Amino acid sequence: MAGLAPEGSQFDARQYDAKMTELLGTEQEEFFTSYDEVYDSFDAMGLQENLLRGIYAYGFEKPSAIQQRGIVPFCKGLDVIQQAQSGTGKTATFCSGVLQQLDYSLVECQALVLAPTRELAQQIEKVMRALGDYLGVKVHACVGGTSVREDQRILQSGVHVVVGTPGRVFDMLRRQSLRPDHIKMFVLDEADEMLSRGFKDQIYDIFQLLPPKIQVGVFSATMPPEALEITRKFMSKPVRILVKRDDVTLEGIKQFYVNVDKEEWKLETLCDLYETLAITQSVIFVNTRRKVDWLTDKMRSRDHTVSATHGDMDQNTRDIIMREFRSGSSRVLITTDLLARGIDVQQVSLVINYDLPTQPENYLHRIGRSGRFGRKGVAINFVTKDDERMLFDIQKFYNVVIEELPANVADLL
């Protein structure tokens, strides 16, 4: 799993603007729609109740920068170009926009999402299905290397959303197994990657088969000229949303992963670690409030002194718990991402990601604190089979290598 992490593509806003000016000349002002509203909570976005339930159940508590600016314009039916590194929560941005606008009483394909690889398409399908869990959404991934007949059967039985790779999607449209008549949203994810893999012609071919009035969303880490060309051809007055990466570093923090075969075995792994290590103070991150309570009970029943905070507690209670943790009267704090940015505790030498974060950018906010004030720190990530993709994405996003936990971990703390 660990191995050299690929270089993250850096984004240069000046270069982008220069290319835009070259391509659009004086039309640039008219080409974009300006949209400056920022929503700092999901509740403020006017989303359906059952979509909000899905978002919170998935483990999101507070929208990331791109979600704060990108979900609402997409929900309003505007064309959007969103430029952000992978891992900034862009998948959930367009999934929320799509799920908000579907007519669930019509079991026809209303949204088509294209991705460059099979793995990414399947990952998007998973997120779409999880966020739409309480809405009863029907999603299907059309990707190469799977049974054509099975695809045809599922499409004919009716789905709301198709996520897929260009080759298989075009094939399904050509065979008329995927009927485009009701498609009203078209999303290109990792557009730069799709174009660099030579899918340009196929994307154009697919677009020709879609209804003329369609909402288009383009999501990409970089904007090569070909991507701009696509935006010109397919989009009308798109909203441009640009999110830069945080300038926080992971320097001085040693990062490891532990393979855990099953979710149920994480607890044993955690207790083993606490028995073998002399830890001054540590923070354990999980993805849901319910899990905070569950893990706190389990740890206490095994005689570990732990405190816990999460978003359901009132501010006063959270402040008291944080004071106790800072003063050292409790050594282990169990919490969720909501509080990741606010834990300024100098003695924290170890951060454990009991659950990997749901988006790579939160990884930094979680573990970036264990090396605060120049102190060295250690981060240990529990990784099940289902987490391997996220671990890879985190390594790619930060251009780091996360090694397997060595036997002599006690010497590092």
Swiss-Prot record:
One of its GO terms (biological process) is cytoplasmic translational initiation. ATP binds at A84, Q85, S86, G87, T88, G89, K90, T91. It comes from the Eukaryota. One of its GO terms (cellular component) is cytoplasmic stress granule. A motif (Q motif) lies at residues 40-68. GO terms for molecular function: ATP binding; ATP hydrolysis activity; RNA binding; RNA helicase activity; translation initiation factor activity. Coiled coil: none annotated. Residues 252-413 form the Helicase C-terminal domain. A motif (DEAD box) lies at residues 189-192. The keyword Protein biosynthesis applies. It catalyses: ATP + H2O = ADP + phosphate + H(+). Disulfide bonds: none annotated. InterPro entries: DEAD/DEAH_box_helicase_dom (IPR011545), Helicase_ATP-bd (IPR014001), Helicase_C-like (IPR001650), P-loop_NTPase (IPR027417), RNA-helicase_DEAD-box_CS (IPR000629), RNA_helicase_DEAD_Q_motif (IPR014014). It is an enzyme of class 3 (hydrolase). Its EC number is 3.6.4.13. ATP-dependent RNA helicase which is a subunit of the eIF4F complex involved in cap recognition and is required for mRNA binding to ribosome. In the current model of translation initiation, eIF4A unwinds RNA secondary structures in the 5'-UTR of mRNAs which is necessary to allow efficient binding of the small ribosomal subunit, and subsequent scanning for the initiator codon. Belongs to the DEAD box helicase family. eIF4A subfamily. PANTHER family: ATP-DEPENDENT RNA HELICASE DBP3. eIF4F is a multi-subunit complex, the composition of which varies with external and internal environmental conditions. It is composed of at least EIF4A, EIF4E and EIF4G. This is Eukaryotic initiation factor 4A-14. The lineage of its organism: Eukaryota, Viridiplantae, Streptophyta, Embryophyta, Tracheophyta.
